[in-house]
Amino acid sequence: MNSPIDKLERKIGYQFNDADLIHLALTHRSAAGKHNERLEFLGDSILSFVIADDLYHRFPKVNEGDMSRMRATLVRGHTLAELGREFELGDYLKLGPGELKSGGFRRDSILADAVEAIIGAVYLDSDTEVVRRIILSWYQSRLESIQPGVSQKDPKTRLQEFLQGRRNPLPVYTVTNIKGEAHNQEFTVECEVAGVDKPVIGKGTSRRKAEQAAAETALEQLSNV
């Protein structure tokens, strides 16, 4: 009999030996009991290493700055959320009542965190080489199409250049909330941007990631104005 998890395992290309790991990876902190944030922490580091290693060997003549920008593009929340939607992760997430009601299963940050948690779970269930193979299979088309150059600028840089080009004031970022233990925090940042009515919210596991997430959202809103 095919369970929902069997279906998800086929989508991600990996069958778990320890089913508890995949269930934990899909459990958001809003749900009761254990949740996926420790797995997310682990998966974030593994993903960054695997992508950095691939870019280093794929682009032997590219400098550190361009490689950093390409990696940032590939591991940012928006890209991870795209992967989550490709796997239809929203159908499998375990959320608390409040997140369910507010549509958390569609939220970029929750989908991105779950993808990182799955990476952490695959690593714990197997080994470094297996998780590398899985990540590279997910990223194959993106790695084949990405190129070094200006298009890889991070969202904060692109937002600043967008505003400067229109002679608008620079964005103002303010940390409005920090929650969680020191090793596992979530930062909430508000970004005030000329041309956007309300401050834009960004969340991330560091201030920098939260600011980048807010800048990405601001760019999307400005492009629709």
Curated annotation (Swiss-Prot):
It holds the Pfam family dsrm. It catalyses: Endonucleolytic cleavage to 5'-phosphomonoester. It is found in: Cytoplasm. Its cofactor is Mg(2+). Residues 154-224 form the DRBM domain. Mg(2+) binds at residues 40, 113, 116. Its EC number is 3.1.26.3. Residues 5-127 form the RNase III domain. Homodimer. Digests double-stranded RNA. Involved in the processing of primary rRNA transcript to yield the immediate precursors to the large and small rRNAs (23S and 16S). Processes some mRNAs, and tRNAs when they are encoded in the rRNA operon. Processes pre-crRNA and tracrRNA of type II CRISPR loci if present in the organism. Belongs to the ribonuclease III family. This is Ribonuclease 3. It comes from Vibrio atlanticus (strain LGP32) (Vibrio splendidus (strain Mel32)). The gene is rnc.
